[in-house]
């Protein structure tokens, strides 16, 4: 290893250690950032309400042209998790707002041979969520329940060059549309970054005065029992800090990749928990041609 390489590695390590330390990496969540996030959420939830009320586009694949829908459904039946960005604008980092970034991703998976009631029983078992969603969920606890409304605690672990741990709480509400469809809305009510986790020095950083890797996390799940199984769709909208000048190479992978990876991982873990014997499909399987004749013969409600 050459001297220049050693110097570059040393400089990179120093930057990582410096950024992860307090207070060097700290940023502050501003009121105007919260206002813009809340405005985006209001617009997004209005869009979601319209799709539920229309009864025509419950899942994102319902809005596709027939040929495209057939192709996507064939991928789902091979066990793939389909994911896409819903963000607008040209930035690959997310939607720029004052003092932060909004990330909006949607994913869907199909799980054969299960029922809607079976699915809801698993996703509502919050005391055991850490067992199903490890390693990203390290701890979980149902704080309270009143009918279809839940208060939940999750300790989250995010790793992408940097590893960050968060203690988070959510208000979650489930709604039954009919005998085959349901949806839920989950709003984070408290997110605190944990410093020195699982050590005697463990403590929470002041809320909104941390590395800024996760300030808000709202998720919207939809469940539809049809075609001999259940489609599960989730849209996740999160708020993070903006990319700090000069440290894009370090911070951008975390802020840019974690939202989509976490969502895809959550749906894959849900599928595995519901039907453990189903093998995972690698990305190489995406090159296989679907059975279009069989898929075209199927008509969704």
Model-derived regions: residue spans:
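Eukaryotic helix-grip
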Residues: 26-301
């Amino acid at each position: 290893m050459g001297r220049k390489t050693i110097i570059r590695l040393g400089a990179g390590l120093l930057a990582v250690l410096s950024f992860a330390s307090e207070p060097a990496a700290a940023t502050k969540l501003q009121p105007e950032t919260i206002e813009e996030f809340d405005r985006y959420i209001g617009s997004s939830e209005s869009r979601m309400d319209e799709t539920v009320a229309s009864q025509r586009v419950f899942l994102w694949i319902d809005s596709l042209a027939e040929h495209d829908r057939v192709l996507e459904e064939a991928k789902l039946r091979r066990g793939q998790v389909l994911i896409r960005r819903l963000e607008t604008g040209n930035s690959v980092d997310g939607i720029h707002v004052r003092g932060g970034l909004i990330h909006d991703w949607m994913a869907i998976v199909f799980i054969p041979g299960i029922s809607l009631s079976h699915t809801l029983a698993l996703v509502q078992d919050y005391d055991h969520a850490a067992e199903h969603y490890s390693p990203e969920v390290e701890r979980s606890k149902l704080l309270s329940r009143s009918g279809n409304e839940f208060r939940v605690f999750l300790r989250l672990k995010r790793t992408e060059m940097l590893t960050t741990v968060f203690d988070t709480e959510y208000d979650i509400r489930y709604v039954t549309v009919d005998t085959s469809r349901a949806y839920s809305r989950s709003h984070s009510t408290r997110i605190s970054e944990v410093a020195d986790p699982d050590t005697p020095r463990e403590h929470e950083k002041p809320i909104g005065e941390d590395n800024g890797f996760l300030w808000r996390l709202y998720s919207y799940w939809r469940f539809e029992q049809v075609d001999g199984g259940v489609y599960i769709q989730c849209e996740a909208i999160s708020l993070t800090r903006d990319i700090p000048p000069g440290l894009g190479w370090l911070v951008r992978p975390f802020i840019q990749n974690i939202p989509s990876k976490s969502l895809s991982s959550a749906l894959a873990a849900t599928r595995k928990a519901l039907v453990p014997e189903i093998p995972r499909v690698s990305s190489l399987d995406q090159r296989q041609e679907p059975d279009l004749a069989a898929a075209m013969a199927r008509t969704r409600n």
